[in-house]
């Protein structure tokens, strides 16, 4: 195709709370879209410095943890194909306590800057951790505030959204992404987050045994009007 007539790159903005959220929850999906040429930008609100895992045996401490977790996240981004990484420099476990208007404004600025087709974040009630819920709530508010033309989705843990009725949703509210072809990248990114995964023996088993622990699909809850009710297996709308 002539360079002048190439279709513009699709863009995805992921706004999460901690290093490793991108890998542990939706690493297969991010690797899939990166391999298809999607330009991915990741925001990590914190550096995860209050995490309790210090390696196995422990090799880091509270003072060295922020730098090490940032380094490990950068490696995971390279592994998954995430092109851009931004930190909001919020202290871990305090996202819900920062000035929310300022946080929403920072996320809105990122949305304007990146102009993403897809925004990923946590569900404000199903995030499973106060930081997750807080960043999800702020991102949802920023998405609405900007009246952005893209689509908003909420990430979900494991296969919890295989039965969305348990959470007040229906199968039509869920997008199911086949990540089977990208599990090797997901496993490699797990291993990049060394200080967080060394205690999990299965991550470091022979590759085929470790890969067998992953599901073949990752699930996303639709969060914006233009995608609600559409049964799909892709986060990007056909234009």
Regions found by a protein language model. Give the residues of each.
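Metal-dependent de-N-acetylase/amidase catalytic core
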Residues: 2-13, 84, 93-239
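Active-site rim/loop-helix segments in enzyme catalytic domains that contact anionic ligands
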Residues: 1-114, 141, 145
């Amino acid at each position: 195709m002539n360079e002048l007539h190439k279709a513009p790159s699709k863009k995805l903005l992921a706004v999460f709370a901690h290093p490793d959220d991108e890998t542990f929850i939706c690493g297969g999906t991010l690797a899939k879209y990166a391999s298809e040429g999607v330009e991915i930008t990741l925001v990590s609100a914190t550096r995860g410095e209050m995490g309790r895992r210090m390696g196995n045996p422990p090799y880091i401490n509270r003072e060295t943890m922020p730098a090490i977790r940032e380094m490990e996240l950068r490696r995971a981004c390279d592994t998954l194909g995430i092109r851009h990484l931004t930190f909001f420099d919020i202290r871990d476990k305090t996202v819900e306590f920062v000035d929310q208007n300022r946080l929403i404004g920072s996320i809105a600025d990122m949305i304007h800057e990146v102009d993403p087709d897809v925004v990923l974040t946590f569900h404000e009630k199903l995030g499973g951790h106060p930081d997750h819920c807080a960043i999800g709530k702020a991102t949802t508010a920023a998405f609405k505030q900007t009246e952005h033309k893209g689509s908003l989705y909420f990430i979900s843990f494991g296969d919890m959204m295989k039965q969305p009725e348990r959470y007040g949703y229906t199968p039509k509210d869920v997008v199911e992404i086949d990540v089977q072809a990208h599990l090797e990248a997901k496993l490699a990114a797990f291993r990049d987050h060394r200080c967080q995964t060394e205690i999990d023996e299965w991550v470091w088993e022979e590759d085929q045994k470790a890969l067998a622990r992953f599901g073949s699909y990752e699930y996303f809850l639709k969060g914006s009007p233009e995608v609600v009710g559409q049964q799909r297996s892709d986060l990007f709308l056909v234009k």
